[in-house]
């Protein structure tokens, strides 16, 4: 692992739960519905995060666990069956129904896998019913997508055909752009997972080479590998450096000539560096502290350090998959401090001690830190923003330059007022 310093920490955490991933997954697969089996708090979280009013009939909902369910006085499975039947009668366009576990449903031991099997047999031919956990008891919010994709892998058809599979949700325009680049390189068969329709799953087999677009798909990658696919080792496509190496990993796997790869990528790289320049001027030399939440922390640290000139104080990660993160770790500066796990109070003490120019953290910590005069960037914004690929490098840098620019404006106004 390069020259980084790895420490482990345990204690109280401050993270969103996996239910949050429903917000981008339901937009990605409009023919799917996500039914959370949880509390009113779960319902409020999803609705608030998605910014969708319930009367707009979004493609997610919550089967509320009442006090009788939590006390074991009611049969939660009977209630769930009733809710599902009512939902499918009212929304016949649903093609895939995900039963999503939550902290409350896991605490009272509702077996959603058994419920999914039972309901699938009842609605066979009409809708596919799957389940996964969105609980935040031991996971971070991005792992919800990992659970959903893992549930879909067994349904993927088998194929011996040689193809490239991009695994992990990408913004549609970004995905289209990346596919165009791969097509120009001569890789004609490029599929995406998850697909834009839940029923149109790509086939998979020994001829499939997988590029992970997101660093939090540990279980999904394992399932794809078990189906015979090859997981390509590469940094993640954040920034120019990571995106170039990511694309080159696929080109090497498909034996594409280096001259063609260079000719295809060099114009994109030149344009991206030009677009990055004004943001590098704002970010260079600034101190950065990343608190653990999204699992994007290491690729972001690599980009902000290597391409934007920021100084890394600490890179916190919820957990570290050394095999998956190996290529990223090799690119980090020497002596980068990486902390796996979280004791939020101790980490906040270190933030205050070093007083960084920018802290990347969860929404729950942002306002208190801002009140102490420390600029922050919400880590959840990285998941909702189109930041992948060479073309998006400047947009990614702008996300981090924006709070620093805002702080400069506020400081100027304060001085003028004085």
Swiss-Prot record:
It catalyses: chlorophyllide a + oxidized 2[4Fe-4S]-[ferredoxin] + 2 ADP + 2 phosphate = protochlorophyllide a + reduced 2[4Fe-4S]-[ferredoxin] + 2 ATP + 2 H2O. Keywords: 4Fe-4S, ATP-binding, Chlorophyll biosynthesis, Iron, Iron-sulfur, Metal-binding, Nucleotide-binding, Oxidoreductase, Photosynthesis. Its EC number is 1.3.7.7. Binds 1 [4Fe-4S] cluster per heterodimer. The cluster is bound at the heterodimer interface by residues from both subunits. It is an enzyme of class 1 (oxidoreductase). The keyword Lipid biosynthesis does not apply. Component of the dark-operative protochlorophyllide reductase (DPOR) that uses Mg-ATP and reduced ferredoxin to reduce ring D of protochlorophyllide (Pchlide) to form chlorophyllide a (Chlide). This reaction is light-independent. The NB-protein (ChlN-ChlB) is the catalytic component of the complex. This is Light-independent protochlorophyllide reductase subunit N. It comes from Prochlorococcus marinus (strain SARG / CCMP1375 / SS120). The gene is chlN.
